[in-house]
Amino acid sequence: NHGLFTWADNAYDCYMNSLEVIERCSEYLEEHVAQKPVFGGQKVTSLAAEDRKLQAATLAPYLRGLCSSEQLMVGHFTDSDRVLEFINSHALDKLAPMGTSCPDHFLRTKIRPLVLNFTPDEDVSDAEKVKEKLTPLFEDYRASYKDYYENHKHPNSPAMRDANPVVILWPGVGMFTFAKNKQTARVASEFYVNAINVMRGSEAVSSYTSLPLQEAFNI
């Protein structure tokens, strides 16, 4: 869960060892990725790029409003091929709730994302209907986060932080991330893409295992 350690007689050789091991691991994973459908294959078909941007731009203000229930948040959106490969897949429902496997990822993205039960071409033009559908999803996420906190806290644990999601996934459209400023939201997006890469490689050679909840909380 923490990374790679390599050893040598000096710093340069140690660095070169790290690069070599990383390259060999990358080649090994890609060989296995090519042997079967990634994430079990695609379940959802993405909208065209222009339509994805339009859907995201329409929904983003509603998501931002709900994510800002405790403090003002700024959003970031990405619909890269790697993100779409994951959020459109058959494995999304299994992998997304499991959470991330690396402490660095978890600290930036929270324990798990919120997955929207919207179709890619969902009509998001009616404000009241959109809020009516989104609000229960956020309420469930907040309740789940509160349960996670209550079940794993220690006597000296700090107060529960903002219970709203950082990462929000919309199959067929893309990924939103929310944080206190644009840079932090963008970094959260990059970290979740890294988490996707970990899940992708793990599922190619074996089965993905997330960070144990208590260990995640202790971080």
State each model region's role.
Residues 6:
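Catalytic cores of glycan-processing enzymes that make or break glycosidic bonds
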